[in-house]
């Protein structure tokens, strides 16, 4: 029998096999389902592609129709003229050609999209239908093949099951036969053992009886042994037979198992792959590839056709040429634009003389008229040349505006990684509303100025043409055609004489000296045109060898002086920048690195003569100094290059004037900025060097300037001992309001904080310390404690002025109307001088200037009983009015004395153009009447002259204000000034903001002393004594003070320090 444990094991084996077969059968079923699902998805995809291209074909057809309608709409308007114009292609204007090509492109796109729609409907969609049908048919056949393969695999698995059962059966029989054989062997051994024991127990009795017993027992034992041996032999034969069958069955099972595993492996690895590749997907991807490539071919050909049309349009756009269009227009309408016939002389009543009569009675008149015409032409040409330069600079600005490269919209077609829609960049593009508004405003303003200058230039050229024709005919008649321009020859000879006698020409040195003294902060310097009459006067004076700008007089228009300097360099026979180095310099401009550009410019310029380099070094050092005041004069290096560049370097003939001028401007700007790195140092090249440190004494040392007298030197030494005592002690101040610094240089503090002031840095700033940090402190946000005690500020030039007792009527007159005759213009010049003197480390010239102020102030002194003045007066330092004034006193009175008109603010003087020639002439006349003699003056005579001059000046100012209200002063480079917000109605506690609103102070209030802070302020500021009450509430300033532009050296003369009012409501000391 077989053991129960063996049967249990057989059952487990069979159960495991059945489970494995079931899993395979389920897997085969899922495989067929998955293939069915793929087939359905494939059919659905092909159906979607058909629907997509069908809808796209409809859209393309609609788009084609709309494009055709659009093209026909505009072609109908231009067909009549178009037929005429296309008869001759050369008569088609370039904009019209662009328009025709654009319409043709639209029609071409319409035809292309119609073709594309037809391809979608009749080519691509049928391909997808065919692919769908083929895919479904092939899948059915593939499914049959797959089902057959699965049936074969299940058949192999069933065969393996049968062989396994047979193996189990034969193996069980073999085990059973083996156990029976072992049992028979045990019985045989047991029988043999019993026989041996019986023989041992029996005792032998007689020999005969023993022999008989033994024979019987042997016979019995033999029969039992034989039986056992026979049984053993049978069982042995049975075991051998079953064992052989079990071995054969096992071998058959192993062979079937190997075959089954090979079949399963082949089905999963090879059969399924071949079924999907060669049956299910047979031709599917290839057919789909051909259909989609048909789509790509259609789209690419559409794109190619579109690109061909766009290339034609691009060529037409590149060929947009105003000059060619002008020529075509004139050729098309030749009869309209051709010059008419000349007017012929029509004799009257038989008068046949058709030429000028140069006989003796009229010869002198013709000669005089020819000379007048020549002089007039010289002036007009200069004026027209100035207008032309301005017009060309404005044209360059317009070209920069209209040619800005803002047409690239590639950023709008950039897609994000998530395949979202096109980026919205409207706010950053050209079409943003703020950008359009600003661009249009700038463009319109520039265009208005350009057409104004163009009209002025054309009118001037017309006049020059008429006068030139008359002049030429007169010259021809008088036989003077060979005569050259006398004024030009005289000027050239004078210039050559000046150039040969000194390194820096007189006109250059004198103009730069004057501008450095009085015009560094003049708004629009070198940009605003001056008076041509005054330019000619100054130029003629220089040609005669004179220096009309020598001395301290300031009755010249700053713009006219700047025009003289530009005119000089423009008229040089040999310009500073020769034309043979033009291309080398233009090559330097293309370098992006500023240092490398400067190095290459230096190499190019070093080949020039030393005299030219000295003049260049002098000029560009001055221009660099001037550009440091760009916040006041609105002239940064780029603006200076635009206005001054054409005068220094002209574009050679044969070059594009507009494009080359932009490179010239960039070159001049680079030289202005990098002049120290470009030009040789004084050690490398000896010669005059422009000095920035306060031009007053520097230019007085010039061979063309005035020398300082011995009296001035003595007074400087005396004044130095008195001003150096208080230079070391700082001033304590209290913060009136909270202030937060806008830069690292400005200090931040809270209201009530204690501040330490070192010195006055500008009109609106102090240099001081707070919480151990040094920096700038705004003047309007603090109260200086020294002023509350009635003590005049330290280091103020006013502290050295002695108060002189005068009759009461003189004091009233001085307060009421003893104004400087030159009005606001001279006040501006004086304050500009003070600003320049602040930047000078030397104190001698500053004391000299304030010494002059003391002479000028002797006619407007305050009450001698004022405690603020009496505390700091020096008893013998000031002469009385009845004594003879020093040499420089009368001239400088016009700058610093009589503060009535000094109440004009800087912006008001700029707005009203108080530095116009008319006001200066009036001011000069008034000054010459009352101050230009060196004999003792009577105070009443001075007061009467001043009152008469003031009345005349105010009348002129009223007239000028009415004219300036409609006068437009254009700006070439479109610098934008902040609108002036000064109200014409002035509060009772403030100073008048304009000479037209100046009121005479006739109430004899005691002790009004002018604050020393007016040395840097434009508005006239007075400090009331403690008894004066201010009713206005305390408020912080409406606007923050403008940071000043400091020189490179930190040494500031103590003579320019000033104090503030202790009252927070006294805003008259600020601008």
Curated annotation (Swiss-Prot):
Residues 181-211, 698-726, 837-936, 983-1012, 1029-1071 are annotated as: Disordered. Residues 855-866 have a biased composition (Low complexity). Residues 362-401, 940-967 form a coiled coil. Residues 181-203 have a biased composition (Basic and acidic residues). InterPro entries: AH/BAR_dom_sf (IPR027267), F_BAR (IPR031160), FCH_dom (IPR001060), Rho_GTPase_activation_prot (IPR008936), RhoGAP_dom (IPR000198), SH3-like_dom_sf (IPR036028), SH3_domain (IPR001452), SLIT-ROBO_RhoGAP (IPR051627). Residues 728-787 form the SH3 domain. It holds the Pfam family SH3_1. Changing residue 108 to K/L/S: Does not affect protein stability. There are 3 duplications of SRGAP2 in the human genome as a result of segmental gene duplications. SRGAP2C is the only one to be fixed at a diploid state in the human genome. Moreover, SRGAP2C is functional, interacts with and inhibits SRGAP2 and is human-specific. The appearance of SRGAP2C in the human genome is estimated to 2,4 million years ago, which corresponds to the beginning of neocortex expansion in human evolution and it may have played an important role in this process through its interaction with SRGAP2 function. This is SLIT-ROBO Rho GTPase-activating protein 2. It comes from Homo sapiens (Human). The gene is SRGAP2.
